[in-house]
Amino acid sequence: MEGKEEDVRLGANRYSERQPIGTAAQGTEEKDYKEPPPAPLFEAEELTSWSFYRAGIAEFVATFLFLYISILTVMGVSKSSSKCATVGIQGIAWSFGGMIFALVYCTAGISGGHINPAVTFGLFLARKLSLTRALFYMVMQCLGAICGAGVVKGFQEGLYMGAGGGANAVNPGYTKGDGLGAEIVGTFVLVYTVFSATDAKRSARDSHVPILAPLPIGFAVFLVHLATIPITGTGINPARSLGAAIVYNRSHAWNDHWIFWVGPFIGAALAAIYHVVIIRALPFKSRD
C-alpha cells in the first residue's frame, strides 16, 4: 500500500531530476547544475502504474477542453458577417493561448501538461519521457481532440459544418510550402519555449526569480496564432488538426492535412535538437 501511495505522489514526475511543465525547479542546496539522467526508451513497469493512466486521462481531458473552447471561439467569429462585431483574430489567438496557459497550469503536476503531440514528440527526442508514455499521451491527446470537436458539432451542427468546423487548411493566396514553413517555425517557437520555460538549469542560475512556466508557453501559442492564422488557421498541434478534420470530414479538411503533422513534428524535432545540442551542451557553472 505504501508503494502505491508513493507511485501516485510521484505521478508523471518519476525522475525527480527532470522538471515537469509548470513547476519551478528546486535544488538550491547545490548551485552547480547537474545533467539529469535520460528517460529509458521503454519502461514496462509504467503499464502497471496508476499514475501512468492518470496522466493519460489528464491529457485526454485537457485536450478535450482545449478543442471545445477554442473551436467554439472560431465558430463565434465565423458566424458573424462583420469581424468587428466579434472577438476577431486577436480573440481567437487569446482563446488558444489562454486555454493552453490554464490547462498547462492545471495538468503540469499530473502529466507534465503537454496537450500536444508535437510537444510530446519534442520532449521524447530530448529523452524527457519514455516511448511508452509518449505514444500513450499522443493517443489520448488525439482522442480528446476528436471528442472536443465532436461536442461542438453536436451543439451547433449547422454552424459547425457551414463554417468549416475549425479545420486547418492552407488559405487561398498561400502555397503548400508557405503553410508547411509556417507550421514548422510556429511549432519550433512553441516547443523551444516549452524547453526554455521548464529547463531545470534555471534553478541554479535564476533561483531568485520565480517562474511560472505556463505563462510563456501560453503566450507563445497566442503570438504564433496571431502570425499564422491568415496562412493555415494555425495548427502547431496535430491533435487539434486531426480532431477538427475527423469531425468536419470534408475534402477541405483533408487536402492539406499532412502539413499539420509533418510541419509540427519537424518543428518540434528542430527545437529539441537546438535545445539539447546547442543550449544544454554549453558549459555551465553558476556564480558563487
Swiss-Prot record:
Domain of life from the UniProt record: Eukaryota
Induction profile: By nitrate in roots. Expressed in roots with a circadian rhythm showing an increase at the end of the night period, a peak during the first part of the light period and then a decrease.
Topology of this chain in the membrane: Multi-pass membrane protein
Molecular-function GO term, any one: water channel activity
Renumbered ranges of motif NPA 1: 116-118
Gene3D superfamilies for the chain: Glycerol uptake facilitator protein
Annotated segments matching region Disordered: 1-36
GO cellular component annotations of the record: membrane; plasma membrane
Tissue: Highly expressed in roots and at lower levels in anthers and silks.
TM region(s), chain numbering: 57-77, 92-114, 135-155, 177-197, 211-231, 259-279
Domain notes from UniProt: Aquaporins contain two tandem repeats each containing three membrane-spanning domains and a pore-forming loop with the signature motif Asn-Pro-Ala (NPA).
Family named by the database record: Belongs to the MIP/aquaporin (TC 1.A.8) family. PIP (TC 1.A.8.11) subfamily.
Main function: Water channel required to facilitate the transport of water across cell membrane.
Protein name (record): Aquaporin PIP1-5
Species of origin: Zea mays (Maize)
